[in-house]
């Protein structure tokens, strides 16, 4: 029996759970079996690219973080979910840190394990030849 608060739109996506039957969550893009969680069912998180089991976390379900390049298990952190860090090469567990999530450092040449130090994340040092312990 379909829950009355969900309706036909939500029931088609397998959204018959009690914790998912709310007006802000009853949308086809959000109400799915992998996204029917109270922490994920918010209007800002009801997007196809964000409603996945790896991304349904309170820290990742925000308008600025609901993107495929950021919403991953290794990058769903408050310090990484900023507009300046929204790049595929920056959303990795090795350099998802506040010191590296900045426009001048969000590049493949700088954001590496050997070059994500505060003193190294500057435009003059973000170069392949400089990404070493002796230089940075």
From Swiss-Prot:
Sequence repeats lie at residues 5-9, 20-24, 25-29, 30-34, 35-39, 40-44, 45-49, 50-54, 55-59, 60-64, 65-69, 70-74, 75-79, 80-84, 90-94, 95-99, 100-104, 110-114, 120-124, 125-129. GO terms for cellular component: cytosol; keratin filament. One of its GO terms (molecular function) is identical protein binding. Signal peptide: none annotated. The keyword Repeat applies. Residues 5-129 are annotated as: 20 X 5 AA repeats OF C-C-[GRQVS]-[SPT]-[VSTQ]. It comes from the Eukaryota. It holds the Pfam family Keratin_B2_2. In the hair cortex, hair keratin intermediate filaments are embedded in an interfilamentous matrix, consisting of hair keratin-associated proteins (KRTAP), which are essential for the formation of a rigid and resistant hair shaft through their extensive disulfide bond cross-linking with abundant cysteine residues of hair keratins. The matrix proteins include the high-sulfur and high-glycine-tyrosine keratins. Belongs to the KRTAP type 4 family. This is Keratin-associated protein 4-2. It comes from Homo sapiens (Human). The gene is KRTAP4-2.
